[in-house]
Amino acid sequence: MFAYLKKKESGIPTEELRITVPKVKTAENSALSLDRTAKLYIGGKQTRPDSGYSLNVVNADGSLAGEIAHGNRKDIRNAVEAAHKACGWQSSTPHLRAQILYFLAENLETRGEEFQNRIMKLTGVSKKQAGHEVETAVRSIFSYAALADKHEGLIHQPPMRGLALALNEPIGVLGLVCSDEAPLLGMLSMLLPAIAMGNTVVLVPSRPFALVATDFYQVLETSDVPSGVINIVSGDAEELCSVL
């Protein structure tokens, strides 16, 4: 009578079923494994090269470090035009330039480990040597920030009656080409005195160490450096210099 209440055998074992789920690679540290082509830095923003091509950069051990944008004649022209448009930097107060350089040094210092690792891989130097270069680079920015508002003019007394004023004025737009030594410090040693005195620059980084310059883009973007003051065009240095 109550047969319908009895538990029917379903034919499926009552033991716990175990389902094997394949392991899926998570996105942890995916940003480090992404292969991206670095852009140029013109007019305060990252831009694609006119040619659409890129160049490989290798580490000291021969492995591929990444790619850099292959700038050409048009990119240099755009960078020079952007530098001329940033003429307000020349008339800015030395105090303002000093404050921006201080901020630049602080932002570079917070990313010191990142630059240290990059220098180690590109040059093959020890961790201590790479760290020393980063520390020296940060101190250099602080030093030029302190000097920015101390480069004052002079008052001369000529042989004739009266006074003569000697004023320090920026040159204007400077073209800078980095050497193949000291990836970070070498670049900043050319860049800092130029912008501290009110000049705008178009910089061509060293091809073997150009990734240090492209990493520097993010430091510039977070340091309130006005658009067009610093323009960086990577590529074949000989080709770019002939245009610059």
List where the protein language model places each region:
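Hydrophobic face of amphipathic alpha-helices that form TPR/SEL1-like repeat modules
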Residues: F2-L64
